[in-house]
Structures are given as structure tokens and as C-alpha cells.
């Protein structure tokens, strides 16, 4: 199978993440999209994160009804911070029967040369890139392993959602009903 790996903090997972995943699953040659919950992004060292298992629970709840989606906690057992190249190597060794593609936003493509061993990633893996606001035209757009995928341009921010929760305002329609129920019942982000 050809699997798209969609890495993220998912703090929380929101409808923007789901729309991007669905677009990738339905409009490209991917068989599945795996939402890889990252315990710690090396570029966001000081970010206040909900515990990784709580974020994994939200991802699992959000994608439960889509057979083309899968939640992955594979980075939980790897050294932190999580570097994409290390996870890709590990996951490719663990699942040699699959081929993997990296799903990233255009804003990440702009910063891709700052990633650990980015040349190795580009040499061995394809990047499926979705549009993001305020992205520049990275020279990597022309790379043979970079595929630009037409997807809705969404400006939904997890920070915005967390702030709404803290202010006791509705997050309806920004997250799935299942995620909203988890956030409210477990009081996630109330003291953010």
C-alpha cells in the first residue's frame, strides 16, 4: 500500500486536518493516510502541549469513521525531539511492505531545508504538499519528488481553538463532535 504520513502535534486535531487528510486520500494515489502524533516538534520546543496520549485519543476519535485513516503513535517510543527523517527510517523498516509519502503544508516546504537530513528525505520519499496561507514559492516546488496537491486553503488554528476553550466559547464546527466531547468532558485546554 501507498501511505501518506501526516505528522503533527494535533493539539487538538481539527477539521482542517481532516479535510487535508481526506483530500489526500481521495484525490491522490494514496491508499491510506496515517496521522502521526508527534510528542515534540523540534521547531516548537517551548510549545505547551497536551499529553501525547490525550492528543492521540483525540486523533483516534476524530478519524474513527474513515477506513482510509489511521492514527499512529509510532513516535512515542522514539527519541525526543522527533525528527522526521528518523521516524521515516524507522517506519519504513517496520513496514517494508508499504511505501510512504510525507504530507506537509506549503509553509513547511518553505522551511524544509532546515529539517534534519532533508536531502535524505527528498531522495527517498515523495512530498505531497498542500497549500497554506502566507507561503512563498519555494525552489523545492520544482523538485521531482515534490507534488503540489490542490486542496482547500484553510486558516484554522489549533491555538485559536485552545483559546476559545479557555474562554469557554464554542468550538463547534472547528473540531469533530467526538473531539469536542473529549475536550469538554476531560477539560482539555481549560487552564491553557
UniProtKB/Swiss-Prot annotation:
Its EC number is 2.7.7.18. SUPFAM superfamilies: Nucleotidylyl transferase. Gene3D superfamilies: HUPs. It catalyses: nicotinate beta-D-ribonucleotide + ATP + H(+) = deamido-NAD(+) + diphosphate. GO terms for biological process: NAD biosynthetic process. Pathway: Cofactor biosynthesis; NAD(+) biosynthesis; deamido-NAD(+) from nicotinate D-ribonucleotide: step 1/1. It is an enzyme of class 2 (transferase). InterPro entries: Cyt_trans-like (IPR004821), NadD/NMNAT (IPR005248), Rossmann-like_a/b/a_fold (IPR014729). It comes from the Bacteria. The keyword Nucleotide-binding applies. Keywords: ATP-binding, NAD, Nucleotide-binding, Nucleotidyltransferase, Pyridine nucleotide biosynthesis, Transferase. GO terms for molecular function: ATP binding; nicotinate-nucleotide adenylyltransferase activity. The keyword Electron transport does not apply. NCBIfam families: cyt_tran_rel (TIGR00125), nicotinate (nicotinamide) nucleotide adenylyltransferase (TIGR00482), PRK00071.1-3 (NF000840). Catalyzes the reversible adenylation of nicotinate mononucleotide (NaMN) to nicotinic acid adenine dinucleotide (NaAD). Belongs to the NadD family. HAMAP family: NaMN_adenylyltr. PANTHER family: NICOTINATE-NUCLEOTIDE ADENYLYLTRANSFERASE-RELATED (PTHR39321), PHOSPHOPANTETHEINE ADENYLYLTRANSFERASE (PTHR39321:SF3). This is Probable nicotinate-nucleotide adenylyltransferase. The gene is nadD.
Amino acid at each position: 500500500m501507498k501511505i501518506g504520513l501526516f505528522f503533527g502535534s494535533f493539539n487538538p486535531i481539527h477539521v482542517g486536518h481532516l479535510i487535508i487528510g481526506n483530500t489526500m486520500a481521495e484525490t491522490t494515489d494514496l491508499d491510506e493516510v496515517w496521522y502521526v502524533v508527534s510528542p515534540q516538534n523540534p521547531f516548537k520546543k517551548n510549545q505547551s502541549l497536551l499529553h501525547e496520549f490525550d492528543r492521540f485519543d483525540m486523533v483516534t476519535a476524530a478519524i474513527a469513521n474513515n477506513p482510509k485513516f489511521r492514527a499512529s503513535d509510532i513516535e512515542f517510543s522514539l527519541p525526543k525531539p522527533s525528527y522526521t527523517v528518523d521516524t521515516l527510517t524507522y517506519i519504513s523498516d517496520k513496514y517494508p511492505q508499504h511505501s510512504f509519502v510525507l504530507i506537509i503544508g506549503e509553509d513547511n516546504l518553505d522551511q524544509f531545508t532546515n529539517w534534519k537530513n532533508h536531502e535524505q528525505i527528498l531522495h527517498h520519499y515523495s512530498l505531497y504538499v498542500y497549500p497554506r496561507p502566507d507561503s512563498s514559492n519555494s525552489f523545492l516546488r520544482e523538485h521531482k519528488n515534490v507534488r503540489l496537491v490542490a486542496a482547500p486553503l484553510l486558516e484554522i488554528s489549533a491555538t485559536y481553538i485552545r483559546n476559545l476553550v479557555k474562554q469557554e466559547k464554542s468550538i463547534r464546527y472547528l473540531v469533530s463532535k467526538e473531539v469536542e466531547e473529549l475536550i469538554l468532558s476531560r477539560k482539555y485546554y481549560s487552564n491553557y
